[in-house]
Amino acid sequence: MKHALSASDTKIQRARRHLVELESEIGDFVASRPVKFNVETIENSGGRSFNFHMHMAPVSDNVGAIVGDIIHNLRAALDLTAAEMVRIAGEDDKEVYFPFCENVEDLDGTIKSRNFDRAGTEAVALLQTLKPYRTGNLALQVIHDLEIHDKQRAFIPSAMSAASPIVRMWDDDGTINPQIIGDPAWPNDIKIMFPNEVGLQGRKLVPTLQELVQLVDDIVEAFRGLASRGLKDDDGPPQLLGLLKRNLPPRVTEA
């Protein structure tokens, strides 16, 4: 027998499988040695000058597509949760969606326009605690924004290399002659980051997505706990775990 919110669980499980696929795709990209360095020597009347160049291969389009799949499943898990909470309350789940809005002043109206008010006062109180608006819970709002972005344009993550090659500057006779020592394509510390246009500058792709998946999982669990109590309106507002109140830090910290 299926338990409450099992459809949402399925979407979260799919998001986790896509995360594994994403890590594999990024691993293949890094293994391909996408960064190369070279020294350009320029001869002129005043002598020689040298330019150092770094060439970075683009990240595979598959990476952006997989990210879109992860976000789509997370948003679907939230919408399925909203609809099932309405059904549990004995109401019609037609046109029911998880509410997102710009600010707290818009939240009550958005709850009604997305028909989530049919889920009952406790479910609404739980949702309000989540602060699903831009100035409230940034991590939750990011899921909404990325879902819209994925529908409108391709998601193209950026690659960064934090390493530089070892360069020998002089020949044995003292002549300046910069040369890269060893393989100019290896090793490199490569990080895959969110593109600037989605508002997540400076955040590593995989750790941030892992946080978002866990956040949605926690939200579903909170609503499941409410559903198991029978949605009684006289029990007072639900209490959320502290981890549901977390937000994305300014930058994802290094592991």
Where are these regions (language model features)?
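Acidic, Ser/Thr/Gly/Pro-rich intrinsically disordered interaction regions
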Residues: 1-255
